[in-house]
Amino acid sequence: MKLWGGRFKEEESKLMEDFNSSLSFDKKLYYEDIRGSIAHVKMLANQNIIKEEEKEKILLGLEEILKEIDEGILKIEGDYEDIHSFVEINLINKIGNVGKKLHTGRSRNDQVALDMKLYAKKSTEEVIECLKELMDSLIKVGNENNYIMPGYTHLQRAQVVTFRYHLLAYFEMFKRDEKRLKNALEILNESPLGSGALAGSTYSIDREYTAKLLGFRKPVDNFLDGVSDRDYIIELISKFSIIMMHLSRLSEELILWSSSEFRFIQIGDAYSTGSSIMPQKKNPDGAELIRGKTGRVYGDLIGILTVMKSLPLAYNKDMQEDKEPFFDAKDTVISCLKVMEGIISTLKVNKENLMKSVKKGFLNATEAADYLVNKGMAFRDAHKVIGEIVIYCEDKNSAIEDLSLEELKQFSDLFCEDIYGFIDYKSSINKGIKKEMGYS
């Protein structure tokens, strides 16, 4: 049974049926589809479009279908065009001809737009929860490991920071991601139900009622836009892509830090894998997969942008292609956030190796220049002097703080005994606004 066909003389080919069917993936929307139908039926009865007893029969049938799906009694499979057909046909089979009144005053165009908005809202809230869990772990692990470490520019050691402060930089990124998602939720929080195919309905549909019942702020203002809007899907996948970019950056650093060349951290066994030939290997595959899956979400974004780029108003079947990219991007970002939270919460930090790396990198060179500025030298001149000292230290395989005062005075008479306290790593990180890094 199809939900259409009266104006056709010939049967749809089996090839076209298979090509046209979306049940294999839009079955994910069964809960949202039934929830939307329940709201629609209640509104129809309130508006005296269907009778009260008809409403009760339809609601009972819908609730039974939902229960049977949840319990695995009713499998979402078979020769159905989509999830909407599956629900409606099973409803008619269950309660009889009264089930045919379910679709009164509604099109699959506003129905699927509603389903996707409801699913997008729920999915975004799930992503936000995963972000919060990761942010909590970043704070916790940072507070437990507030050790001095090198900060980098161009992947070259630059200045002293702390492990905690470094993790907090990612906390800020994910906090912005959370704000972006919440903003997207506010924008999409308008119900398309009641828009019909594209031009509303001749029935006195109460769109405000269904919008409120389904948790939306208001109904959409324009029917055409209501059924053809997929901006929110593009926007959400775009925001998921930014989250993945942040996760990929963090993954890259964890991969580097866990390598034998750095040895800053150890990634827990639970989030590592081994080699089939090299017994000694412990590979950071969790972080590497997150880094790799970033491109997958970017691909989902490009895919949906390309689908929508030339579509005239209003609904077009091309829009069926919005679902798989969104489902994939949502599932990917959630799994990556969960794995990253696991990696962060179980990693071990090597305090000694962090400090060794600090001492090898002339990370107090800027502070040494600031010292000379405080003694009256212009910064550009101080910059040149310290650069010459660095060359001298490299030739001697020494650090600035290991030079004698006599050696330092070869470069400037402004150096005094207090230079050593000024460029001490633990002391310098608590000077000026560096105190905001919170090292103690």
From Swiss-Prot:
SUPFAM superfamilies: L-aspartase-like (SSF48557). GO terms for biological process: arginine biosynthetic process via ornithine; L-arginine biosynthetic process. It is an enzyme of class 4 (lyase). It is found in: Cytoplasm. Disulfide bonds: none annotated. GO terms for molecular function: argininosuccinate lyase activity. Signal peptide: none annotated. Pathway: Amino-acid biosynthesis; L-arginine biosynthesis; L-arginine from L-ornithine and carbamoyl phosphate: step 3/3. It catalyses: 2-(N(omega)-L-arginino)succinate = fumarate + L-arginine. GO terms for cellular component: cytosol. Its EC number is 4.3.2.1. Keywords: Amino-acid biosynthesis, Arginine biosynthesis, Cytoplasm, Lyase. Its main location: cytoplasm. Belongs to the lyase 1 family. Argininosuccinate lyase subfamily. This is Argininosuccinate lyase. It comes from Clostridium botulinum (strain Okra / Type B1). The gene is argH.
